[in-house]
């Protein structure tokens, strides 16, 4: 869900997008359940990559690790691959990220970003190598790093109280996201429900429409930024995890400037602790 950053190749943006949208949750607390998922990534209906996630989650904490790589037709563009790791807590029905790290590697460049947060405020960011700054980039302010979640925390959808997990409460929200370089909102709106079947899960998912709203750190005149800000063809399907009262992405569909990218689970399972 990133706008184009300077110096980032298409293949690296594809990996970053895949990892950011895969953001599935887990945690290292007592009585943790183990969550595993495998995703296929397609562009224009053609397979271009795969992604795997594994982690643990509970009512009050999460940890996730995911990796993605281009394959099949995707290797005709690049041999890009990436990995992401994140930790945090769920407090009073709200996600409170603690750490976020992502590495994206292409044929000529590997970039690593690490970020720490406390109380939904960014306490540190390290990007190596750093992005080249551009004069047309909207400057980041201190307030752009407060009251935010990282791209992984953005897709850990917690539902407080007794609201049904698969219903409007899953979607009707605005999520403030800081990815270490840009600040944007994700505005979710409830569309309805669907029934899905994959290895490990068969049941309902909440369908949410998503709008990307750039706030700071982006380059407003870039075609990719304008396209995403006007994009009305972004959708996420969220599967429930009743024990933790969270929902996780089952399927993500994003129209891009070169066609629609779909990330969909072929395996999605929760193993309860014993």
Place the predicted regions along the sequence by residue.
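Cleavable N-terminal signal peptides
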Residues: 18-20, 30
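Acidic, serine/threonine-rich low-complexity disordered tracts
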Residues: 31-119, 164-274
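Long, charge-rich C-terminal accessory regions
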Residues: 155-161
């Amino acid at each position: 869900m990133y706008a184009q950053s300077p110096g980032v190749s298409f293949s690296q943006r594809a990996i970053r997008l895949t990892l950011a949208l895969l953001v599935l949750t887990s945690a290292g607390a007592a009585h943790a359940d183990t969550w595993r998922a495998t995703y296929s990534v397609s562009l224009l209906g053609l397979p271009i990559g795969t992604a795997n996630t594994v982690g643990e989650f509970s009512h009050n904490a999460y940890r996730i690790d995911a990796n993605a790589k281009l394959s099949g037709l995707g290797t005709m563009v690049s041999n890009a691959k990436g990995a992401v790791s994140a930790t945090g807590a769920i407090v009073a029905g709200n996600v409170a990220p603690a750490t976020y790290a992502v590495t994206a590697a292409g044929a000529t460049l590997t970039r690593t970003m690490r970020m720490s947060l406390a109380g939904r405020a960014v306490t540190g960011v390290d990007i190596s190598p750093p992005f080249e700054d551009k004069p047309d980039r909207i400057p980041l302010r201190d307030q752009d790093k407060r009251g935010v979640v990282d791209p992984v925390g953005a897709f850990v959808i917690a539902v407080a109280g007794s609201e049904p997990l698969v219903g409007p409460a899953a979607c009707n929200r605005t999520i403030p996201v800081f990815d270490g370089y840009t600040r944007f909102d994700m505005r979710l709106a409830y569309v309805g429900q669907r029934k899905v079947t994959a290895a490990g899960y068969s049941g309902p998912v909440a369908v949410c429409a998503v709008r990307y709203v750039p706030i700071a750190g982006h380059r407003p005149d870039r075609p990719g930024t304008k396209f995403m800000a006007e994009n009305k063809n972004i959708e996420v399907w969220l599967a429930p995890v009743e024990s933790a009262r969270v929902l996780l992405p089952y399927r993500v569909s994003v129209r891009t400037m070169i066609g629609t990218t779909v990330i969909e689970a072929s395996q999605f399972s929760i193993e309860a602790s014993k």
